[in-house]
Structures are given as C-alpha cells and as structure tokens.
A protein has these predicted regions:
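Classical nucleotidyltransferase
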Residues: 1-73
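C-terminal accessory "lid"/substrate-recognition subdomains
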Residues: 218-221, 235-263
Length: 263
C-alpha cells in the first residue's frame, strides 16, 4: 500500500485486544465490529479449529484448502464410476469423472486401442483439471473416479513403460483417502474395455497394488464383490475420514438410512 500511496485511516476488527497494538504500531485507529459476537457468534479461530462445523462461514475461495479428497481405484468394470456417483450423491458433493474415457471418445473416436504413449500426459492433465474443479466446488469432501496411479498403470500395461509427466502428478496429488476396489465384480463389456479375462483382471489388479506401494500411497482394500456391501463400506470409510466434523453436520442416521435403502 505504501508503494501505491495508499494510507489507511481505519482498521476494522472484532478483536478488541488488538486495537492498542494497531494504534501503537501503525498509528491507525481501530473500529470494532460486534466485539461481543452478539450478531455473528463466530471467530476465525473457531473456524480453523473446526472448519466443517462452520463450513458456511468460510469464503468460497478458501474452502478448497479444507476439502478432503477420496479417490476410488480399481481395474476395468470394477464399479468405480457408479460408486463414485452414489457417494457424491449421498454426501451432497462433487466428483471428478474419469477423464480418460472422455478423452478416448473426444480425441480417438471411441477406440481405446488407438491410444499412444503421447496421449497419457494429456489424459493426466485433463484428470488433474477435473480433480481441481471438483475440489473447488466440493461440499467438504470430493470424490475422484480413478487417480494418476491408475493412469500410469494403464500406460505401463499398454505401452510397456511409465510416463514421467504422469509420475509428476502422482507425486503432486496426494489424496486423503484412497480406496482400492477388488476386481471381482461381473465383467461388463462397454466397447472400451479390453482386460476382461480373469488372468488380465488379476494381473492389472496386482499392478495397481504394486504401484501404490512403490509410490508410498496408503490405501484401503475393499474386497467384497457385492455392490451394496462395497457402497456401505465406503460410506463408513468416508465417515471415519471426516470423523466428528461430519457427524455434527450430516444426519446422524446417514449410514442407517443407506442400509435401509432410503438414500
């Protein structure tokens, strides 16, 4: 402000104890606004200690700093996309779709076999943009359909080598909770998937686990083949992640309602 010739006349604050310091250090008078918190019973300290409880008081630009991220991983036809959509609905929040599928349709005419090594950095960058968008507008938690480890695993599977740009995003984007789905659900051919044999599915699952470990990424392995059991287990895991903050904000009967099929 000094460089631009701006001289403030007043400082507006709710902290009465700070007024003498502003006067002494800056020579500026302080105008106190609601110092007794009678109109707005909240403080910055309260928000920092318990951001989810006071979520509505946090500016939109600041909320992404507090958002928790949950990545759902798994091989082809493991139910990731459907599960992510259900979780986003039940927690009333955003999700990042799998950009790789969109890329194949928009750039390769829907032919996954046309993928080349040079495509994987573009896929990873698109996925990062999807993640950033989901986090920006999330309601406390954002769900991610497929992470960068999965993109790297497909690159290694199809191209025989890893991509350095994808690895850079693996290192940069560390999610708060990573859930790995066992690839033991019924295979559904959708025109894009090519790893449908039992051998291929198991091989890719092993590759995912190996790459998670090599990148020092902790994950929770959900092994049930039952879709409902998977869903309920993931709800539990997310509730544990958000812990007491979520319990104060969400309905206490969230899980019980899910079990009863009300959500």
């Amino acid at each position: 402000m000094n460089e631009k010739g701006i001289v403030p006349n007043f400082i507006y604050s709710s902290e009465s104890q700070d007024a003498p310091h502003y006067r002494e250090q800056f020579g500026i008078e302080t105008i106190l606004i609601d110092p007794e918190r009678s109109f707005m019973n909240i403080s910055g300290r309260q928000i920092r200690r318990d951001p989810f409880r006071y979520w509505d008081y946090i500016p939109t630009e600041v909320k992404p700093f507090f958002v928790r991220t949950v990545a759902i991983l798994g091989g082809e036809s493991s139910g990731k996309s459907t599960l992510v959509n259900k979780l986003a609905n039940i927690f009333n929040t955003t999700s990042a779709w799998e950009y790789g599928r969109d890329y194949v349709f928009s750039h390769l005419g829907g032919d996954e076999m046309a993928l080349q090594y040079s495509d994987y950095d573009k896929i990873a960058l698109g996925q990062a943009q999807y993640v950033d968008f989901a986090v920006k507008y999330a309601n406390k938690v954002a769900f991610i359909d497929t992470d960068f480890v999965t993109t790297q695993a497909f690159c290694k599977k199809y191209e025989g080598r890893e991509h350095p740009f994808v690895q850079a995003l693996i290192d940069e984007y560390r999610f708060d909770l990573v859930i790995l789905l066992e690839n033991n659900t019924p295979w559904v051919a959708d025109g894009l998937r090519s790893l449908g044999s039992e051998r291929d599915r198991k091989s890719f699952q092993n590759l995912l686990e190996q790459m998670l470990r090599s990148n020092n990424i902790e994950y929770v392995h959900v092994e049930s083949a039952d879709y409902d059991e998977r869903f309920l287990r993931c709800v539990e895991l997310v509730q544990q992640l958000l812990a007491a903050d979520l319990q104060r904000l969400a309905r206490p009967s969230l899980l019980s309602e899910a079990r009863e099929g009300q959500l």
